[in-house]
Amino acid sequence: KLSGNFEIGGQDHFYLETHVALTIPGENDEYQVWSSTQHPTEVQHGVGNVLNIPSAKIDSKVRRLGGGFGGKESQATIFAAMSALGAFITQKPVKIRLNRHTDMTATGKRHNFKVFFTVGFTTTGKLLALDIKLLSNGGNVLDLSGPVITRALTHLDNCYFIKSLKAIGYV
C-alpha cells in the first residue's frame, strides 16, 4: 500500500491569433457571425440563445479552423455573443478583437490539478486497488471545467485493469 499526493501544472492555450468576433446584422433577424472558433455550431447556438432567436437565423462562419489547441473550443462563444448582442442592439456590424492580456485573463486554461491517492498492489507489483481524489483548479472561468474533470476521472485508469477503484473529482 502506498499513499501520497502530487500536483500537475496547468497550461495556457497560446494560440497566435487572439479571440476575434464580427457580427453583421442581416434581414429578418438573421445575423452573420464570424468567429475565431474551433466550434462554429456552439457559437451558432450560443448566439441564438443570447439574442433569443432560433439558431437557424445565425450564420456562423469561421475563416480558419485549427491551431487553437482547444483554447477556442467553447471560449469563442462568449466573445461572439458579445459581438452579436452589440450588433442586435445597434443594428450595425460589431467587431471584437481581444488584446493578448485580456484574452489570457478572460479565458479558461488547461487546469492544474492536485491529486491525493492510496494505491494497493501485490508484492510483485500487480495493481489491485486505487482510491484517488482529483482537485481541479477551474480558475475564474468554468467553460470546460466539467468536461475536463469528467475526462480526467474516466481516463485515469489508462490501460490498467483496477479491480477496486474509487475516484472522486472536484472543480
Feature map (PLM): residue ranges:
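Structural alpha/beta core scaffold segments of enzyme domains
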Residues: K1-V171
